A protein has these predicted regions:
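Active-site-adjacent substrate-binding region
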Residues: 155-183
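Loop/turn elements at helix/coil->beta-strand transitions in domains of secreted/extracellular proteins
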Residues: 36-37, 86-91, 117-124, 172, ...
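Active-site-adjacent mobile loop/cap segments within catalytic or ligand-binding domains
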Residues: 39-42, 126, 133, 178-245
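Extracytoplasmic/secreted envelope proteins and their assembly/folding machinery
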Residues: 74-81, 104-107, 156-163, 190, ...
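Short, low-complexity, charged amphipathic interaction modules
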Residues: 1-20
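Solvent-exposed loop/turn segments at secondary-structure junctions
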Residues: 45-48, 96-101, 129-135, 151-154, ...
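Mature extracellular/periplasmic domains of secretome proteins
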Residues: 104-120, 190-195
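Active-site histidine-acidic residue metal-binding/catalytic motifs
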Residues: 19-109, 133-134, 140-142
């Protein structure tokens, strides 16, 4: 929250630095810009999704670190949407249900916004935590990464801002890159980022079957850093996007 307050203060300083007779116009323009793009936040999985939990929650393997991905995804997504809206952006949860909404239905929801608002006025961020194994043991894989669909798209540009933010907030953690196609993000044919009409990325926020990673992402500090990282990436991307228009 400290970073959000800081952003608000910086925003107000920018506004009040203008001439007094320009204040109203500047404020209107800034608020119009911030609400121009629909930011859809997808909280992956649901209460009825099989697996998607720590080895302790799956089979009782020590250490005792309970974790259900659907709960964690929703906690991060809820706070992210709240804080983006608080600073004037048009952010919305894609899934408000607690059950697992199918990928087809999620994609249809996104594409409905694309048809109504124009696909260039919508972005999708799908939030997940990662896993290497099947929940029967603690694994060694660690780190943060983001995925886009195959090929060169605007999604790659969004991912660049996420990797920049990840390097800032997770400087002491492993960042997982794939430079084989000339950019930093990983690519995959994941249904929701492949079939949505708008730019879309999927973030994998460390491994819940790695002991050190799960301790981090379930801590107050870890959650705060993950939320702040997403906010910084989204805001910086949109500010640069506006400048290119």
């Amino acid at each position: 929250m400290k970073n959000i307050i800081k952003k608000i203060i910086e925003f107000l300083k920018q506004i009040f630095s203008k001439k007094e007779n320009e204040l109203g116009m500047a404020l209107t323009e800034e608020l119009n810009y911030r609400s121009k793009i629909k930011i859809l936040i997808d909280n992956g999985h649901g209460i009825n999704t099989s697996g998607k939990r720590s080895p302790y929650s799956m089979t009782g393997i020590e250490p005792e670190i309970p974790f259900l991905e659907y709960e964690w995804n929703r906690e991060i997504a809820d706070e992210l949407v709240y804080e983006l809206c608080f600073i004037g952006f048009d952010a919305e949860l894609l899934v408000t249900e607690i059950t697992d909404i199918s990928l087809k239905e999620r994609t249809q929801r996104v594409n409905k916004y694309c048809d109504e608002l124009g696909k260039e006025n919508v972005i999708l961020i799908s939030i997940h935590a990662n896993a290497m194994g099947n929940g029967t043991k603690w694994e060694k894989a660690t780190g943060w990464e983001a995925y886009t669909c195959l090929g060169k798209t605007e999604s790659d540009n969004i991912a660049k801002f996420f990797y920049d933010a990840a390097e800032k907030y997770f400087s002491d953690k492993k960042i997982r890159y794939d430079w084989s196609d000339g950019d930093c993000d990983k690519e995959a044919g994941f249904y929701i980022i492949k079939n949505t009409k708008c730019p879309a990325i999927l973030t994998e926020n460390f491994f819940y079957d790695n002991i050190e990673d799960i301790k981090f992402i379930t801590s107050k500090e870890g959650k705060r850093k993950i939320i702040d990282m997403h906010i910084d990436a989204i805001v910086n991307y949109l500010e640069n996007k506006e400048g290119d228009c």
